[in-house]
Amino acid sequence: MKVLHICNNFIGSTVHQKMVQASRQRGIQNVVFAPVVTMKGRVMPGEDEHAVVCVNKWDRFFFHHKQEKTYRALRKTLPHMQYDLVHAHCMFTDGNVALRIKREYGIPYLVTVNNTDINHFFRLRILLRSRGIEILREAAGIVFISDAYRKQLFDKYIPAEYREALMQKTHVIPFGVDDFWLSNLCQTKGEELQNKELRLVYAGDVCRNKNLETTLRAMGELKARGWNVSLSVAGNVVSQRLYKKITSDPAVTYVGILPKENLLELYRTSNIFVMPSFHETFGLVYAEALSQGLPVVYSRGQGFDTQLPEGTVGFHVDPYDHRTVASALEQIAEDYPAFRRRSIESVARFDWNAVATQYQSLYCRVAPGADKAATARRIDE
């Protein structure tokens, strides 16, 4: 089976690179087309992976103009449209190109719906909503990273007359976590937290979307309830204003950008991972934290919500209400050993091998005429 991946974020996202690599190991011949603004400081990681400078930073404001430039670049780079399937990794920007390929060459396509599709295109770019529905209706399959995003899209933006037909084409497949974390699972058992001491950790950009200010207010609420709480922050500083605010709190320690080996050690000396983001397609850091026995606090209705049954490895919270964050942290702390044990047990579902198997099975079902028997044999191995 030969699959064309259209992914505008391919070289900026290890997630998509890992997915392509994992499915290639399962017998899929993958070709990647990634339209980019610049290649400065960037290198394509593998064979049959094409990054093409064909758009500029202003094109994002002119959807149809950008789409035309992208399609022309695709046809120039890959003139022979001999694929069994197209996988568009962003429903609007990549899916619109896939729709055109289908109409011109008859090649079916899958689309993945992510945070940008829902919280930018559907929510803000109202004039493009009908095009979004068109892309979904003609897709052979619709992939969501979480059931929470599927529910959000169908509840808010899918017209009633299309819901049943579109729902039948949907599939929920999570992202996988880097093998490093699965090869270094924490083996120590969790103990009861002593003296109401709680060590929180966050890893990611220091920016508004990650909602560190609500985390700080939740810490204040916990202190009022008698907890001795601290927070370690690791990651890139995007907002200097926010950085100055969090580091002015004596309970917060900023440790900079850490390699994964050092981040692992930070996780192992912490109790709970907290990230009540406003918007999150998935949040790989949650899964990484789980591998080290850290229960997690995540936002209701965002990418990690519903990945696991509520209350299994943590709780969802209202990102606008610090009291819900404080209560979630307290609930976890009061039954900490059980949450820690379940956190480690749950991370197997984020193994890239398991994720790739789901994708190969889906590819086989929606791509008529492909060599499905050979691919199916690889899946069963």
State the predicted function of each range.
Residues 310-322, 330-334:
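Conserved acidic donor-binding segment of nucleotide-sugar-dependent glycosyltransferases
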